[in-house]
Amino acid sequence: MRITQLSSQSFAFPSPELALREPNGLLALGGDLSPPRLLAAYERGIFPWFSPGEMILWWSPDPRAVLYPEDLHISRSMRRFLRNCPYRFTLNHAFKDVIRACATLRDEGTWIGDDVQQAYCHLHTLGHAHSVEVWLENELVGGLYGISVGSLFCGESMFSRANNASKSALMVFCHHFTRHGGELIDCQVLNAHTASLGAIEIPRNFFLQQLSQLQFSPLPAECWLPQSLNFSSAMQ
């Protein structure tokens, strides 16, 4: 099956059902990282993933990794850590710093080049991309970022510079997200880290069905205002 070359004159994408089985989910190439194209992609269950300096590749894997926030797994050791958690948490206080940290701290190398950082920072200024920050005193030690699509959150990347920083960021975010009506977190591709936190794989067509409904259920504006996140209430 041939891969679709995206047109510079249109933001249209081929159906995710046309994605390759190997490599799993590769659907299209080319285009750009402009806000209209990125939003069109996420609204169709498609995301960019490519190496810096290479052509943009667009993916929609089958199966799809997701996390239902109510199924978030908190281990016994994590619960012990959280009882005396030294961190404070914020939302949308340092998006640029979070995505830069995600770009520099990924063990397997990074796909988050300068062009990707600029594109997602632009989405952040438009109110579509969001970050969670973890602070130890005044130092940023962990966080995550992603894209909101209605009551679905497309998680892109997380980082940790201190013990359990990224895990605690996700736990606090899940509480905040569900409290405002959020229903599903897209993890894209399952890995050992997300699986340990409760992420599972579901068929792509089921994910797309859920996406088609959730994207038309926006969360209240106050969900995404820059704010401190209440850690203690998240653990009740």
UniProtKB/Swiss-Prot annotation:
Keywords from the UniProt entry: Acyltransferase, Cytoplasm, Transferase
**Recorded E.C. number(s)?**
2.3.2.6
Subcellular location as annotated? Cytoplasm
Choose any GO biological process term that the UniProt entry carries and state it. protein catabolic process
Q: Name one GO molecular function term.
A: leucyl-tRNA--protein transferase activity
Specify whether Cytoplasm is a keyword of the entry: yes
Q: Where's it mainly located?
A: cytoplasm
Listed under GO cellular component are:
cytoplasm
Enzymatic class = transferase
From the UniProt record, list the reaction(s) this protein catalyses.
N-terminal L-lysyl-[protein] + L-leucyl-tRNA(Leu) = N-terminal L-leucyl-L-lysyl-[protein] + tRNA(Leu) + H(+); N-terminal L-arginyl-[protein] + L-leucyl-tRNA(Leu) = N-terminal L-leucyl-L-arginyl-[protein] + tRNA(Leu) + H(+); L-phenylalanyl-tRNA(Phe) + an N-terminal L-alpha-aminoacyl-[protein] = an N-terminal L-phenylalanyl-L-alpha-aminoacyl-[protein] + tRNA(Phe)
Known Gene3D superfamilies for this protein? Leucyl/phenylalanyl-tRNA-protein transferase, C-terminal domain, Leucyl/phenylalanyl-tRNA-protein transferase, N-terminal domain
By sequence similarity, the record places it as follows: Belongs to the L/F-transferase family.
Q: Which PANTHER family match?
A: LEUCYL/PHENYLALANYL-TRNA--PROTEIN TRANSFERASE, LEUCYL_PHENYLALANYL-TRNA--PROTEIN TRANSFERASE
* Listed NCBIfam families: aat
Protein purpose: Functions in the N-end rule pathway of protein degradation where it conjugates Leu, Phe and, less efficiently, Met from aminoacyl-tRNAs to the N-termini of proteins containing an N-terminal arginine or lysine.
Spell out the protein name for this chain: Leucyl/phenylalanyl-tRNA--protein transferase
What organism is listed for this UniProt entry? Yersinia enterocolitica serotype O:8 / biotype 1B (strain NCTC 13174 / 8081)
What high-level taxonomic lineage is stated for the organism? Bacteria, Pseudomonadati, Pseudomonadota, Gammaproteobacteria, Enterobacterales
Q: Which gene encodes it?
A: aat
